[in-house]
Amino acid sequence: METIAKHRHARSSAQKVRLVADLVRGKKVSQALDILTYTNKKAAVLVKKVLESAIANAEHNDGADIDDLKVTKIFVDEGPSMKRIMPRAKGRADRILKRTSHITVVVSDR
């Protein structure tokens, strides 16, 4: 049984979160949680929260056994970017893009 958890509008760029997502794709959830716990990146905290949510969803909604679960799919899509203005010298201004991402984790017991 596949179970999904999503975090939409996560305040980190998709490029940075994908680096962490690639570390846990295809792993057992216990091993994935260990990897994320000791990965020293902000994105690891975001991905870990979504993975824990997916595990809880599988246990509560589908009655799955946690020991059998694997991360079957994990993907990160770009979310909307917030545009901000950075004042510069001589009356000019630059646009700053504060990027967001949508993190999706699918766990399965197969």
From Swiss-Prot:
InterPro entries membership: Ribosomal_uL22 (IPR001063), Ribosomal_uL22_bac/chlpt-type (IPR005727), Ribosomal_uL22_bac/org-type (IPR047867), Ribosomal_uL22_CS (IPR018260), Ribosomal_uL22_sf (IPR036394)
Keyword terms of this UniProt record: Ribonucleoprotein, Ribosomal protein, RNA-binding, rRNA-binding
Signal sequence coordinates: none
Cellular component annotations (GO), alphabetically ordered: cytosolic large ribosomal subunit
Organism superkingdom: Bacteria
This protein's record includes keyword tRNA-binding: no
GO BP field: translation
Complexes and interactors: Part of the 50S ribosomal subunit.
Function in brief: This protein binds specifically to 23S rRNA; its binding is stimulated by other ribosomal proteins, e.g. L4, L17, and L20. It is important during the early stages of 50S assembly. It makes multiple contacts with different domains of the 23S rRNA in the assembled 50S subunit and ribosome. The globular domain of the protein is located near the polypeptide exit tunnel on the outside of the subunit, while an extended beta-hairpin is found that lines the wall of the exit tunnel in the center of the 70S ribosome.
Name this polypeptide is given: Large ribosomal subunit protein uL22
